[in-house]
Amino acid sequence: MGIHRKSTSIDIEQIKELSKLEGEFLEAKNQRDEELKRVIRGEDQRLLLVIGPCSSDNEDAVLDYAHRLSKLQEEVKDKIFIVMRVYTAKPRTNGEGYKGLMHQPDTSKLPDLINGIAAVRHLHYRVITETGLTTADEMLYSANYPLVEDLVSYHAIGARSVEDQEHRFVASGIDMPTGMKNPTSGNLTVMFNGIYATQNKQNFIYRDAEVYTDGNPLAHAILRGANTEKGGYEPNYYYDILLKTIKQYEQFGLENPFIVIDTNHDNSGKNYLEQIRIVRQTLINRDWNESIRKYVRGFMIESYLEDGRQDSPEVYGKSITDPCLGWEKTEALIREIHQTL
């Protein structure tokens, strides 16, 4: 019984010296961060695409993917702004299974979170410095935010965390775009309350001190579908649901309204191939309705080198968590989006 210490106290400033961005790399990241902020504020009309593996389990495969994605970003940069998913901590429904690079930097060995922190920073650093892309990650543990805040450009608050007050309050101190998912129940009021709390100033105890925040006006919505009590799936990217969501967005009076459609999870019913159809249908809905076009300006897509998923890391570039689109389909889909816009 109880919580038992496994390591000495973590020195955040010492951790930040690992894989630290400097010089031209820091300047390039800052420039892309400003572009991303303009996209969220509606000052840049490019479509936001947050795309990449469900979980970043293999550094070589993730970098391989990142180099391919970087070349494609250059090709479509006039209409699409890409942020790569480099998700390093994974929520587990029942607490079991692979929990991400943060927990297990080597999938063949036992959890090692201290080395996991170093591995996470190293991976984000390599993607940024070797490809010129900037990265997205889920803030699964609110206490870990300071460990990566200088590297991650887009933060996501997951479906299981969006109701949590500490996640909301910590997110209110983030000065980068922060997407907040609807909860697994599909209750959009919960999500909008989360965005409201995140956009406002907050006071709370964080780590070992009383803190206050300035509020995060770049917090926005991610629609990921819902899971029913009977284990079914309820998508929330349909035309009529989007109109209701937009109406609720307006009623809350939030700053910088912006909706990202998560094409996997409960929207796809875990059928990764459905992501292609969901993107196509959403683009049609944007063309059909000006309000949808104004609000729905981003996609979150799970994609890797190989189609599908596997239980253990045997096939290079194939997900060991949720199934993903392979690179061929990913490349074709991004080009299709670019041509359609």
Residue ranges and their predicted role:
Residues 54-57, 256, 264-270:
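Short acidic, Gly/Ser-rich segments with clustered Asp/Glu that frequently serve as metal-coordination loops
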Residues 7, 66, 79-244, 248, ...:
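Active-site-facing alpha/beta catalytic cores
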